[in-house]
From Swiss-Prot:
Protein name: 4-diphosphocytidyl-2-C-methyl-D-erythritol kinase
Species of origin: Citrobacter koseri (strain ATCC BAA-895 / CDC 4225-83 / SGSC4696)
Superkingdom of source: Bacteria
UniProt EC number: 2.7.1.148
InterPro entries, A to Z: GHMP_kinase_C_dom, GHMP_kinase_C_sf, GHMP_kinase_N_dom, IspE, Ribosomal_Su5_D2-typ_SF, Ribsml_uS5_D2-typ_fold_subgr
Gene name tied to this protein: ispE
Positions of transmembrane segments: none
Reactions catalysed: 4-CDP-2-C-methyl-D-erythritol + ATP = 4-CDP-2-C-methyl-D-erythritol 2-phosphate + ADP + H(+)
Primary enzyme class: transferase
Subunit structure: Homodimer.
Pathway annotation: Isoprenoid biosynthesis; isopentenyl diphosphate biosynthesis via DXP pathway; isopentenyl diphosphate from 1-deoxy-D-xylulose 5-phosphate: step 3/6
Residues engaged in binding ATP: P99, M100, G101, G102, G103, L104, G105, G106, G107, S108, S109
GO annotation terms (biological process): isopentenyl diphosphate biosynthetic process, methylerythritol 4-phosphate pathway; terpenoid biosynthetic process
Family statement drawn from the similarity comment of this UniProt entry: Belongs to the GHMP kinase family. IspE subfamily.
Catalytic residues, chain numbering: K10, D141
Length: 283
């Protein structure tokens, strides 16, 4: 029987680049919050040890898809711990709503949902810590989706402290361009020396995103989207883009602005939530 699992979006409510390590990775401080909006992953367990992705993503080989990689990595990890029941496999499908290269964490969220769901369905019994550690090898953002609570992240994004920022309503807009993360992080003009601050200090300051100036400069679509949103509410880039978002106190206020969105913007309204929809599904 197929079961359905939420794979929610995230927003970076702020994102500051505090340095760059010798290995090229950037150190940062960021605040993750989930949205009650995202992809849906369907999973039907198999008994022959095979992993089949029933809904391939255009332009991505199945073996390279984070969904397939996550499933196979869980197999390997659980097997190494002697916790993989014989014949564990799955047919997996995805109903995709989150854009690729949008800064909403779609691929990382998909991987985390697969790890959490298959750990449950296969009855592997891996702990949240073990799943998060496994997920980190797939991407720096995967652990926050596995843990499922809004978090302040440091290091390269792997040091997580649970926090409970206000749960606002957001209008999120995708300007029709995909921004690969390396494009932003390799840009010579990216600020890389923002001073580190405590979470208490950061929460009292106006939120910002160090990647925003680069995304606006290099992608006119992002600049146009932000220019439009800023007419209505405080707005900024999420992650390395391309999505931008504006915050509102009420759903009705966000939807009033959504009605005025230009046709070239793909926009939606969602609520920020500190407990991930995936975690709620596990309760």
């Amino acid at each position: 029987m197929m079961t359905h699992w939420p794979s929610p979006a995230k927003l970076n409510l702020f994102l500051y680049i505090t340095g760059q390590r010798a290995d090229g990775y950037h150190t940062l401080q960021t605040l993750f919050q989930f949205l009650d909006y995202g992809d849906t992953i369907g999973i039907t367990p198999r008994g022959d040890g095979e992993i089949h992705l029933l809904t391939p993503v255009e332009g991505v080989e199945n073996d390279d898809n984070l969904i397939v990689r996550a499933a196979r990595l869980l197999m390997k990890t659980a097997s190494a711990h002697g916790r993989l029941p014989a014949g564990s496999g799955a047919d997996i499908s995805i109903e995709k709503r989150l854009p690729m290269g949008g800064g909403l964490g779609g691929g990382s969220s998909n991987a985390a949902t697969v790890l959490v769901a298959l750990n449950h369905l296969w009855q592997c019994g891996l702990s949240v810590d073990e799943l998060a550690e496994t997920g980190l090898t797939l991407g720096a953002d995967v652990p926050v989706f596995v843990r499922g609570h809004a978090a302040f992240a440091e290091g390269v994004g792997e040091i997580l402290t649970p926090v409970d920022p206000p749960e606002k309503w957001y209008l999120v807009a995708h300007p029709g361009v995909s921004i690969p993360t390396p494009v932003i992080f390799k840009d010579p003009e990216l600020p890389r020396n923002t001073p580190k601050r405590s979470i208490e200090t950061l929460l009292k300051c106006e939120f910002g995103n160090d990647c925003e100036v680069i995304a606006r400069k290099r992608f006119r679509e992002v600049d146009a989207a932000l220019s439009w949103l800023l007419e209505y509410a405080p707005s900024r880039l999420t992650g390395t883009g391309a999505c931008v978002f504006a915050e509102f106190d009420t759903e009705s206020a966000a939807r009033q602005v959504l009605k005025q969105a230009p046709e070239w913007l793909n926009a939606f309204v969602a609520k920020g939530v500190n407990l991930s929809p995936l975690q709620k599904a596990m309760l």
